[in-house]
Amino acid sequence: MAKVRIVADYCGKGYQLLENGETAGTFLIGAPLQERLCRWNERYEAHCDPLHYEDVSGAGFDFVAFAAEGLAIARAVKRRLPQWTVTYWDEALDWYLSRDPRTYDPTRAEYEITLRDAFTDTTLRSQGGAGGQPR
């Protein structure tokens, strides 16, 4: 099965294809989503200095907002490629987990985006559920 990791990285594209030759050149997500992914990665390169990971206040780079946008992109990729395995490297989670170097395990910052995740309406969740009632 074809696999893609959505991950911001320096000198990257915002994604990494995880299958050898099989999926090379077949990451067909459409121009608008490809451009969104590229802009997201460019913002990481331009504004996220590696030293920002050491800033516990998060004042240098908004990891939470950046990760939320990345998750939205990963969900959109999964909707476009439902047969693919899509994983997402969560920069906010990585930033948080790296606070304790004794227990830091970078693999905990990556998780799979399922079809259920991809089609979940986050606006309902933020409003307290389908009835719109706060929880």
Mark where each language-model region is.
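Intrinsic low-complexity, intrinsically disordered or marginally ordered coil/linker segments
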Residues: 1-135
